[in-house]
Amino acid sequence: MNPNQKIITIGSICMAIGIISLILQIGNIISIWVSHSIQTGSQNHTGICNQRIITYENSTWVNQTYVNISNTNVVAGKDTTSMTLAGNSSLCPIRGWAIYSKDNSIRIGSKGDVFVIREPFISCSHLECRTFFLTQGALLNDKHSNGTVKDRSPYRALMSCPIGEAPSPYNSRFESVAWSASACHDGMGWLTIGISGPDDGAVAVLKYNGIITETIKSWRKQILRTQESECVCVNGSCFTIMTDGPSDGPASYRIFKIEKGKITKSIELDAPNSHYEECSCYPDTGTVMCVCRDNWHGSNRPWVSFNQNLDYQIGYICSGVFGDNPRPKDGKGSCDPVNVDGADGVKGFSYRYGNGVWIGRTKSNSSRKGFEMIWDPNGWTDTDSNFLVKQDVVAMTDWSGYSGSFVQHPELTGLDCMRPCFWVELIRGRPREKTTIWTSGSSISFCGVNSDTVNWSWPDGAELPFTIDK
């Protein structure tokens, strides 16, 4: 083969290789385009199902090792349309209480970053339920948890997290600087009320969707305080009760009507022989019912009911099944304050059904231990101590604490009635458990159902002391 033939042969081979390579590249491009078309079609199909992808990323230190955790969840999208919560439904008929949530925050906090808290409560919008709580500006098992038995300090803040989750810096939302608080949703936005400042001049800061809208200055200069549970929204107006004055004698009690964070009306209760603190309130057929704590002289609970014009009625739960702590043994009740063991108290709640009442209370008469729900079919109006149903939720041997009511509106549940629910604070640490340097709590919650329920104990369950306590 002469040199020219060699050149022609080599050129032909190179051209053939080039053509083959070009064909392969064109095939690759076509393959990628087809694959992309299939994926795009699949994504469009997913969009029809109205789903969204949410990625949670959490970075932390574990035993001096940096760990980055990424968790991608595909969840069905919800209709986030705003609506006014009517609040005009009656309470759902119920036979008992089903466990709804348990956050186990003290157990988790022995090894994880969990806030030191107290006064947790739950409130629901038409889309979700959230746990609100008052932090101490500290984490469990950390040096700043020392001395957190104190109720009022400049480090306390109202925060919230998804219900059932342990409150941590990674899942919690700041709401307000506060050592006393309330919150509720009107269907369009969250109203938060946070009280902070000195005992003789505290100020309540009202926020609507996170923006300050109003302030209320202490009018008696004696520890302005509010509910430590959810406020109530009816037809676009939200209602809350505040107390200012002595905790062991007559004080001043005011109801506030609030629209989009602005106060539109307020009244002072004429109740010289009653004592209202830390009220647990709920809507029922367009009115608001509040069951409160008498820290002055009643071992039964006071109540106040009012309409949207703030026309009100007051009284005490008449049942001989007493709801406060401390309290005497069940016996003869009264529609006025029951003075036996009437001093001091604990935040609590009840639900009225006509002449009957569901009473939530500690199982112990003298300490914040255990918790039970009792159905007294005539307890709202009659003074005997007969009851039909008792459901245990925390055993006598386990710590409890504050408790309060919250409701789930029909706009959330799809029911044609207002579902009654409650939460129980499970306090751990000081002052009762002196092996610790801190005070905090976890929480459980239950909702009323017209089906089978169970007696059991859902305690906090943390093993104390922690490393920081030793």
UniProtKB/Swiss-Prot annotation:
Its EC number is 3.2.1.18. GO terms for biological process: carbohydrate metabolic process; viral budding from plasma membrane. Pfam families: Neur. Substrate binds at residues 118, 152, 277-278, 293, 368. The chain crosses the membrane at residues 7-27. Disulfide bonds join 92-417, 124-129, 184-231, 233-238, 279-292, 281-290, 318-335, 421-447. It catalyses: Hydrolysis of alpha-(2->3)-, alpha-(2->6)-, alpha-(2->8)- glycosidic linkages of terminal sialic acid residues in oligosaccharides, glycoproteins, glycolipids, colominic acid and synthetic substrates. InterPro entries: Glyco_hydro_34, Sialidase_Influenza_A/B, Sialidase_sf. GO terms for cellular component: host cell plasma membrane; membrane; virion membrane. Glycans are attached at residues 44, 58, 63, 68, 88, 146, 235, 365, 455. Inhibited by the neuraminidase inhibitors zanamivir (Relenza) and oseltamivir (Tamiflu). These drugs interfere with the release of progeny virus from infected cells and are effective against all influenza strains. Resistance to neuraminidase inhibitors is quite rare. Keywords: Calcium, Disulfide bond, Glycoprotein, Glycosidase, Host cell membrane, Host membrane, Hydrolase, Membrane, Metal-binding, Signal-anchor, Transmembrane, Transmembrane helix, Virion. Residues 91-470 are annotated as: Head of neuraminidase. Its cofactor is Ca(2+). N-glycosylated. Residues 28-470 are virion surface. Intact N-terminus is essential for virion morphogenesis. Possesses two apical sorting signals, one in the ectodomain, which is likely to be a glycan, and the other in the transmembrane domain. The transmembrane domain also plays a role in lipid raft association. Catalyzes the removal of terminal sialic acid residues from viral and cellular glycoconjugates. Cleaves off the terminal sialic acids on the glycosylated HA during virus budding to facilitate virus release. Additionally helps virus spread through the circulation by further removing sialic acids from the cell surface. These cleavages prevent self-aggregation and ensure the efficient spread of the progeny virus from cell to cell. Otherwise, infection would be limited to one round of replication. Belongs to the glycosyl hydrolase 34 family. This is Neuraminidase. The gene is NA.
